Structures are given as structure tokens and as C-alpha cells.
Amino acid sequence: MTVTVRFAPSPTGRIHIGNARTALFNWLFALNNKGRFIQRFDDTDIGRSKQEFADAILYDLHWLGIFPDATEYQSRRFEVYDAAVERLKAAGVLYACYETPEELDLRRKVRRTRGLPPVYGREALALTHEQVAEYQADGRRPHWRFLLPNFTGDPLQPERTEVHWKDLVRGEETVDLASLSDPVLVREDGTYLYTLPSVVDDIEMGVSHVIRGDDHVTNTGVQIALFKALGTEPPVFGHHNLLTTVSGEGLSKRTGALSIESLREDGIEPMAVASLAVLVGTSENVAAAHDLTELAGHFDPAATSKSSAKFDPDELFVLNRVLMHHMPFDEARDRLMVLGISGEQAEPFWLAVRGNLDRLADAVGWWRILREGPQDRPEFSDDDRDFLGQAFEVLPEEPWNGTVWKDWTGKIREATGRKGKGLFMPLRLALTGLPSGPELADLLPLMGREGTLARRP
């Protein structure tokens, strides 16, 4: 059997870090099992779903390193769902209901006052032909519910019916179908809710493993029953913990600051996002992986905590710095070129400055300093100005080699008697305009003698 997973968001907005966690869990699981990854858009809500969001989601996934084996749209598969509806009706497990939302709300309140669970009481099953005709004459159109198999003889007398499955993440799980309402599969206007298309597509597309957030645990009992009603054994399920903000709030597509788009625009590397999204809330230490293949080696669904995990954006910047500090020039070259950093000096420049970068785009500032000199001229005391005058007088002649910084500072020490911070800080300020930064031993050869002398205060 080929392992087949799917990531199935609704294209009603940009995806956030929590959505990315689900996509990455599926991708890494497929990677570890030589399986297939299907990108499926649950776009049956025609009014809210937009192709531009679907395209944006695919762009975000590609940026993360996820390249689906197939892309499917539920909005193009209504005939398949219609056929499944007819099968369920023929089997007597999909029934018409005519209650209005107000009537359903009133019934829930009545059940609560009687100490009963606020689930649907299947009153529609007891409707007479006359009552149905009257509803239809009044212009009411039915919605359709799936009859859960939680009874022995009389569906109006549900009894405890446990559905069990071994969850990839959570271990043994149980849902009592008697505690649930029969789910509405088809609305009054004939459109589909999430449940039926999802199950039908999982069957039709050969999905072997469904990995998603643990807010779907209760849904799983219903879906297992629906799989069986359609004559198919259910897939293996895995429900990972959800990410929250640092303050404990749930993430949503309106959590703009944590959208993949905003993180990308903020200069965060895709592997910083992927590493934190996958490893936070697991027994693994959070560390920056170089690529998804390396990250897959640290991925085990069973190592995921059952408790929600807080996603701290500050941790992203820590991981981002690690990735910057170790990024080979070959990986950075094309992106640096877009920023205007190219030529013979590009590689030694990158190797000199990468250890001081939070984001790759920060290299632009150091490139300007290298090419143009300090962007803000520092102020010096009279003593430091005199010291710098002497220092620039003993600047070695070219050609320079890798020891020029050591040679120069040795001469400065002999000429001025200064050492330590008193020697190095005025030089750093004169050469770069900043009190800290890359090793001057690496920058000085890139400045050249003429460029260095031009920085003399």
C-alpha cells in the first residue's frame, strides 16, 4: 500500500503557522514513508472560496519546500458527492429534516432543562407524509442528516456506541456516537458541508492516513461511521496538538502577524518556520534543520504532546540567525544578486558578514558600508581623532593579504601604545560607523587601501 496523505484547507484566506504545521506533518510523514502528498482545496463554499487564495496557499507551500504530487478542487467534484448522497439515501442512512434554526435552538434549550445532552432528537424520522407535505407546501426545503449507527433497533432510542481508533499521535481514542447529533451533510440549498466531500474524497483519492489538528478528534467518530456506511474501511487518523499565540489565543486566518506571507515578508527563512512549526510542542529539541529531509529525521508523530503548544515568534528569529550564520554562499548567491550584491567580492563579503545577520536582507546595510563607507559619521574625542590620524599614517601599503589587519594593528600599537578596546573601538567606528559587527580582519581586505584611507576622520 502506498502511503497517501492530504492537506485540505479552505481557500478563504492566507494560511498561518498552524496550517503550515499540519501541512508539514503530512509532508514529512509522506517523506518518511515514500508516500504521496495530495493538496486538496475544500472549496465547496463557493461564496467565500477564491482561486487567488488557493494560488497563494500553493505559493506558501512551495516556499516551505512542499510540492504536492497532485492538486484537487472539491468544487469540481460535485457529481461524485451527488452519487454518494444517492447511495446513502438508498441505504436509509440519510434523512430529510425540515426544522428551522430557531426551532432547533429551542429544542436544544428544552433538552438542557430536562438534563439531556443538547443533541438532535431525530424528530424528523417521526414525521408523517402529511407533515412533510405541509412543510413543502410552506416552501420549506429539507436539509439532510446522516443517521449515526448508535442504536440497536429503534433510532429514536440511541444507546452508547463507542468508536475506537489508534491515533498516530494520541494513541487509543474513543468517541461515543450517542453523545453526538446526526451531522448535517447537505444544506437546504443543496450545498455540502465539510464532512461528506471530505470522506468521499479520502475514499476516491486513496488517502491512507489523515493527519490534522486535534480539534477534529470528535469529528473522527462521525467520519469513521460514514466511511463504513459507504462501504470502505477508514484510513489511519492522527491528531496533532494545536498551536496558540504566546498569550494562549487560538490561531486563525485573521491572525495576520503569523501568516506565512507575513513571516516571509519579515525576512524569516522557510526552514526557520518549518523547524519551529514542526518541533514545538514535541519531545524533540527545537533546532534549525537545514532542509525538510533533515527535519524529517527528527519527525515522529507519536512524539507530539497532547497539550497545545505556544508559538513564540521570538524563537523564529533565534532559528533564523542560526540559519544565516551557517548559510553557504551557493545558497545565498542568487538572493544576494537580487539585492545588488554581486561580483568578485560577493562571496568573501558574505562569509564575512553572515555571522552578524538576523535576516539575509540585512546584508545590504553592510554592503553599503563596504562600498560607500559609514552611513553615519561618528563623533570622536580629540584624543581618539589624534589616535586615528596616527593609525592611518601606518596603514600598510598594498598588495594586502589575509594578515593585513594583524599587521596594521601591530604597527598602530607600536606607534601609539594603545591596545584592547582603546585601540579597536575607534578603528571600528571609523571604518564602519558602528560599535559592533563582522570581524575587521575580514572586512579590511575587502575595503582595500584606498577605501580604507577614505574613512579617515
Swiss-Prot record:
KW Hydrolase (keyword) present: no
Residues that span the membrane, as ranges: none
Enzyme class: ligase
Coiled coil segments of this chain: none
PANTHER family to which the protein is assigned, alphabetical: GLUTAMATE--TRNA LIGASE, GLUTAMATE--TRNA LIGASE, MITOCHONDRIAL-RELATED
Keyword terms, alphabetized: Aminoacyl-tRNA synthetase, ATP-binding, Cytoplasm, Ligase, Nucleotide-binding, Protein biosynthesis
Superkingdom to which the source organism belongs: Bacteria
Quaternary structure (record): Monomer.
Signal peptide: none
Catalytic activity: tRNA(Glu) + L-glutamate + ATP = L-glutamyl-tRNA(Glu) + AMP + diphosphate
Subcellular location per the Swiss-Prot or TrEMBL entry: Cytoplasm
Principal localisation: cytoplasm
List of residues binding ATP: K253
Protein name listed in UniProt: Glutamate--tRNA ligase 2
The UniProt record lists the keyword Membrane: no
Segments carrying motif 'KMSKS' region: 250-254
Gene Ontology cellular component terms for the protein in this record: cytoplasm
Entry-linked SUPFAM superfamilies: An anticodon-binding domain of class I aminoacyl-tRNA synthetases (SSF48163), Nucleotidylyl transferase (SSF52374)
Family per record: Belongs to the class-I aminoacyl-tRNA synthetase family. Glutamate--tRNA ligase type 1 subfamily.
A GO molecular-function descriptor: glutamate-tRNA ligase activity
A Pfam entry, by short name: tRNA-synt_1c
Motif 'HIGH' region mapped to chain: 9-19
